[in-house]
Structure formats: structure tokens, C-alpha cells
């Protein structure tokens, strides 16, 4: 039982933030690499500083991968890792649950 509680607590500490959830959900919805400014616009009113911090956290947790192109100008994109895709699958369940119970 302790191991299960510890796993749940660790997961919540990683993703239990409004902006982390909103960012991962945006990747789950689009299913393609996304750029910083696109996320900043879609997640308004998030500040650029908050978005930057949360993206760094998601990269640190290996949920997102940051890719830097070798083109000029340099293009930076983020995309879900396998771990991130697995996490994004939870959003489908959360969406179904939300639709079912939103009227109560």
C-alpha cells in the first residue's frame, strides 16, 4: 500500500499544477510538436515566465522533449516523449469523467 501511495504522491507532485496539466493537454489535443509562442497564445493568460518555467519542468521530468533546429533562424519546438504520451492518455479519461459529471 505504501508503494502505491508514494507513486501517487510523486505523480501529483510532478503534474498536479494547473499550468502543467493545461500544457500537456494542449500537446494531447494537437498531437504534434508545438512552439513556445503558440502555447503562450493558446494558454492565455499564462505569463511567458510561467510558461518557460513549466516547460523546463516538463523537460526535466522527461514528459516533453525540447528540439532545437539547426536552421537559420533557429526554431525551438517541444513534443511529448513516450512518457508524456502515456500521461496524455489520462486526459481522455479525465475528459470523459468531466463530461459525465459536469452538470452536478
Regions found by a protein language model. Give the residues of each.
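HhH-family (HhH-GPD) DNA N-glycosylase catalytic core used in base-excision repair
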Residues: 9-14, 65, 99-104
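Basic, amphipathic "hinge/linker" alpha-helix immediately C-terminal to the N-terminal HTH DNA-binding motif
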Residues: 70-91
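Basic amphipathic alpha-helical segments that dock to polyanions
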Residues: 51, 55-58
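Amphipathic alpha-helical dimerization/coiled-coil segments
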Residues: 5, 89-104
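N-terminal helix-turn-helix DNA-binding core of bacterial DNA-binding proteins
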Residues: 6-50
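A short, conserved structural fragment
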Residues: 59-69
Amino acid at each position: 500500500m505504501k508503494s502505491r501511495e508514494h507513486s501517487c504522491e510523486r505523480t501529483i507532485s510532478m503534474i498536479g499544477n494547473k499550468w502543467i496539466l493545461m500544457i500537456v493537454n494542449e500537446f494531447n489535443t494537437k498531437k504534434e510538436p508545438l512552439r513556445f509562442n503558440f502555447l503562450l497564445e493558446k494558454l492565455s493568460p499564462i505569463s511567458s515566465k510561467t510558461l518557460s518555467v513549466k516547460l523546463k519542468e516538463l523537460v526535466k521530468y522527461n514528459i516533453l522533449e525540447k528540439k532545437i533546429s539547426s536552421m537559420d533562424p533557429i526554431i525551438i519546438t517541444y513534443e511529448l516523449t513516450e512518457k508524456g504520451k502515456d500521461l496524455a492518455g489520462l486526459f481522455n479519461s479525465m475528459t470523459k469523467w468531466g463530461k459525465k459529471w459536469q452538470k452536478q
